A protein has these predicted regions:
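N-terminal acidic, glycine/proline-rich low-complexity segments
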Residues: 2-242
Length: 242
């Protein structure tokens, strides 16, 4: 269904999460290319870039001419620019937050919170602002897998990632047992949802909102009732009961 059509936007400096997610997409046979946004500055980030290239992955500094499915583990700077003249069918992103006003299950660290800071959104808040306001002519669907599910203990090797097919990938990158696999979760969910397969999470239609743009300190949440300048998105609200 999505044979080598996923453009993955990666931030390779922060930790191993993005490179594992990119490798996962490559293993699944759905990866078209990796676009670096922001471009890595650290030794580790540049090594991760070389590692992807050694797998035969195309690694770019800018968006390719056609990007039907865009999965995001980095910033939205290049996407915001791209959609001025191009269309994306599905934008799937590790980002955002569904809080106490909507989520039935809350993690202790977010109990009672409706908004939190979220890394990928805040890499470039103006770009995020643009993307979340884009209409269907520019982006057909937006799917957000946010902090409320990413930080869950289930998002680890002892939880949903305990299958044999993941072991080799995790050992290759020395992924710790308790490491939350934020970007890999978003990638898995995007592939599964678009292909009509089983997702790990439950989804609901919400609108993102913030408490005012404030650079990297911007706090984001989701709403079904309040007025917001942003469009409706599909957001992960919790894990399915197993």
């Amino acid at each position: 269904m999505m044979d080598k059509e996923v453009v993955y936007i990666a931030e390779l400096d922060a930790d191993v999460d993005d490179v594992v997610a990119a490798h996962y997409l490559h293993n699944k046979g759905v990866l078209k290319c990796v676009v670096l946004d922001p471009y890595p500055k650290t030794k580790e980030g540049l090594e991760r870039k070389e590692r992807l290239e050694s797998l035969g992955v195309t690694v770019l500094k800018k968006m390719p001419p056609i990007a039907k499915y865009v999965f995001v583990g980095g910033a939205l700077t290049l996407v915001a620019d791209y959609i001025r003249m191009h269309h994306i069918d599905w934008l799937v992103m590790n980002g955002g937050f569904v809080g106490t006003n909507i989520a039935t299950y809350e993690l202790d660290k977010f109990k009672g919170k409706e908004t939190v800071r979220t890394f990928n959104f805040n890499c470039d808040v103006n770009a995020t602002d643009t993307v979340l306001k884009a209409d269907e002519r520019h982006i057909g669907h937006i799917m957000l897998v946010g902090k409320n599910v990413c930080h869950d203990i289930r998002n680890t090797q002892s939880g949903i990632w305990n299958g044999d097919e993941y072991k080799e990938l995790f050992s290759k990158y020395h992924v710790k047992e308790e490491k939350r696999l934020h970007d890999m979760l978003a990638c898995h969910e995007g592939i599964a949802y678009i292909n009509g397969e089983d997702t790990f999470c439950e989804y609901d239609v919400v609108k993102p909102y913030n408490e005012g743009l404030c650079g990297t300190m911007t706090k984001w949440g989701s709403t079904k009732t309040r007025t917001t300048p942003y469009r409706e998105v599909l957001a992960a609200v919790g894990y399915k009961k197993s």
